UniProtKB/Swiss-Prot annotation:
The gene is Oas1a. Pfam families: NTP_transf_2 (PF01909), OAS1_C (PF10421). This is 2'-5'-oligoadenylate synthase 1A. It comes from Mus musculus (Mouse). Keywords: Antiviral defense, ATP-binding, Cytoplasm, Endoplasmic reticulum, Immunity, Innate immunity, Lipoprotein, Magnesium, Metal-binding, Microsome, Mitochondrion, Nucleotide-binding, Nucleotidyltransferase, Nucleus, Prenylation, RNA-binding, Transferase. Its main location: cytoplasm. It comes from the Eukaryota.
Length: 367
């Protein structure tokens, strides 16, 4: 398939996505069925025999399957288990291991029940306080195995209202705990619903472009190996390119793809953030955001978690990916029918930052 994407002309990209990247209906039904089995197990059965009462407040599907950007043949799902027993971010950090241990124990026990006609293959972890439990699920009614990552989390958001921002005090507490623990981005799982909602309601064609970029990223990963920037950074870069450069339900896929690759090439200039869920209105959050946005670029802040710079800490990975992106710009997938090259959208690499109020009552702007 790599050879296919390298060699196909620009006007056939939509067909390529439809034929090779979009999951079919059987695949989608399998994943949905498997997710329902695991969710029911986690909510109704898993913690019944625990030494202390455990209450699951909700189970949220995250990752690609939650966002609606799954690639064909990738049967995996992230499930975040929100537990009322976890009462702070630090509590999640310290106690997640005990809940993962209990989930693992119950998965082993349920194998021996005849009425439970599914098989769990639990992956071993060398970490005593691992962030997640990984396992594979198979069942007679499924056409293939489905891989799961289950992550215990502190339910800091409670009921998520899609029409309004979370209380900014939540982010102030997050920032305070992350700063004191030195764990920026550690608790992004607590904001899985917001990460999912940020992408889930996007136009179908934008999700197709995200799939194409993810496929390109996987090809780069196979060729280059590690280190590379996280895939999530590329997903957010794709959303940013579309928002700034087009914003329409229908657009030229090759143009969008080229724009994303050009942003990758210009990674040293990137400073990107959104104010959908947090902004500069709360004093402590504002101070922290200004500090984050002054850091060495690239900076791409997780739209749901301001402590997570998903582009940070890996300049070598960005350099290698940028070199590969530069090579790709000369491939046929960016050539039009008349032989001319596909142009990119006009997209900035920097999102402006508002004035910062300082103690001496004068203001300065971050350039």
């Amino acid at each position: 398939m790599e050879h296919g994407l390298r060699s196909i002309p620009a006007w056939t990209l939509d067909k390529f996505i439809e034929d090779y990247l979009l999951p079919d209906t059987t695949f989608g039904a399998d994943v949905k069925s498997a997710v329902n089995v695991v969710c029911d197990f986690l909510k109704e059965r898993c913690f019944q025999g625990a030494a202390h009462p455990v209450r699951v407040s909700k189970v949220v599907k995250g990752g690609s399957s939650g966002k609606g950007t799954t690639l064909k043949g990738k049967s995996d799902a992230d499930l975040v288990v929100f537990l009322n027993n976890l009462t702070s971010f630090e509590d999640q950090l310290n106690r997640r291991g005990e809940f993962i241990k209990e989930i693992k124990k119950q998965l082993y026990e349920v194998q021996h029940e005849r009425r439970f006609r599914v098989k769990f293959e639990v992956q071993s972890s060398w970490w005593p306080n691992a962030r997640s439990l990984s396992f594979k699920l198979s069942a007679p009614h499924l056409h293939q195995e489905v891989e799961f990552d289950v992550l215990p989390a502190f339910d800091v958001l409670g009921h998520v209202n899609t029409s309004s921002k979370p209380d900014p005090r939540i982010y102030a507490i997050l920032i305070e705990e992350c700063t004191s623990l030195g764990k920026d981005g550690e608790f992004s799982t607590c904001f899985t619903e917001l990460q999912r909602n940020f992408l889930k309601q996007r136009p179908t064609k934008l999700k197709s472009l995200i799939r194409l970029v993810k496929h390109w990223y996987q090809l780069c990963k196979e060729k280059l190996g590690k280190p590379l920037p996280p895939q999530y950074a590329l997903e957010l870069l794709t959303v940013f390119a579309w928002e700034q450069g087009n914003g329409c339900y229908e657009f030229n896929t090759a143009q969008g793809f080229r724009t994303v690759l050009e942003l990758v090439i210009n990674y040293q200039h990137l400073r990107i953030y959104w104010t959908k869920y947090y902004d500069f209105q709360h004093q402590e959050v504002s101070k922290y955001l200004h500090r984050q946005l002054r850091k060495a670029r690239p900076v791409i802040l997780d739209p749901a978690d301001p402590t997570g710079n998903v582009a940070g800490g890996n300049p070598e990975g960005w350099r290698r990916l940028a070199e590969e992106a530069d090579v790709w710009l000369w491939y046929p997938c960016f050539i039009k029918k008349d032989g001319s090259r596909v142009s990119s959208w006009d997209v900035p690499t920097v999102v402006p930052v508002p004035f910062e109020q300082v103690e001496e009552n004068w203001t300065c702007i971050l350039l």
